[in-house]
Amino acid sequence: MLEINKIHQMNCFDFLDQVENKSVQLAVIDPPYNLSKADWDSFDSHNEFLPFTYRWIDKVLDKLDKDGSLYIFNTPFNCAFICQYLVSKGMIFQNWITWDKRDGMGSAKRGFSTGQETILFFSKSKNHTFNYDEVRVPYESTDRIKHASEKGILKNGKRWFPNPNGRLCGEVWHFSSQRHKEKVNGKTVKLTHITPKPRDLIERIIRASSNPNDLVLDCFMGSGTTAIVAKKLGRNFIGCDMNAEYVNQANFVLNQLEIN
């Protein structure tokens, strides 16, 4: 088995062939979207993209333990195919999550503009880890909370006490994209990786679907966000990327976390 708590420079297929089967509790995958934003994201056609996608999915599924969970990022269009494929492989559908990026609304003129991505959440069994109390979010209606907190009764007469940690998390997630967060004087700056995911978004996934010392896998590590967040949360990780610059930079950050 490859060394854990390290990002390896290799392609996803060679990497997955060397990861022990049924050793992973959580896989968080941000793969190519076939949007031609870079060489690694470019395919001749959708008919070429799908077999590539299904191939790495098959290998990832072998690595999940019997109660493992899988999250996959992609466009809504691609996720329609991926969702159907995962169901055909016997995976259990949990959620179709919409990530509202709150920026980058695009320039669509023949349809609604896009400012969101899809995150598919599947599990291998009904006994998968899900720590719902770890990912509660603030209540939206403060008046309702105030009334219930003071009297223990809602205005409709039902008895209810708000959870001090917030309400249960839903399927629409509001996180600004990393490129939006790192704007300078209102202008987008060039990032090392073109599509890094926000750390707080990845943190929500890892907190919800893994426990301390679990192994988290990402076979398209990019700038290393999954590994960095996993390490900070006390999880083990293993991952790869083909880009030497991404891998070296991410491993440097991880080593600094170790030192500190």
Swiss-Prot record:
Residues where S-adenosyl-L-methionine binds = 12, 30, 197, 223-225, 241-242
**Any transmembrane segments, and where?**
none
Q: Single Gene Ontology BP term?
A: DNA restriction-modification system
EC number per UniProt = 2.1.1.72
Write out the GO cellular component annotations: cytoplasm
Enzyme class, UniProt record, top EC level: transferase
Looking up Pfam families in the UniProt record yields: N6_N4_Mtase (PF01555)
Q: Which UniProt keywords apply?
A: DNA-binding, Methyltransferase, Restriction system, S-adenosyl-L-methionine, Transferase
Q: Which reaction does it catalyse?
A: a 2'-deoxyadenosine in DNA + S-adenosyl-L-methionine = an N(6)-methyl-2'-deoxyadenosine in DNA + S-adenosyl-L-homocysteine + H(+)
Sample GO molecular function, one term: N-methyltransferase activity
What this protein is reported to do is described as: It is not known if the cytosine of the complementary sequence TCTTC is also methylated by this enzyme.
Protein family per UniProt: Belongs to the N(4)/N(6)-methyltransferase family.
Subunit info here reads: At low concentration exists as a monomer and homodimer. Probably binds to DNA as a monomer.
The protein's name = Type II methyltransferase M1.MboII
Q: Which organism is it from?
A: Moraxella bovis
Per the record, the gene is mboIIM
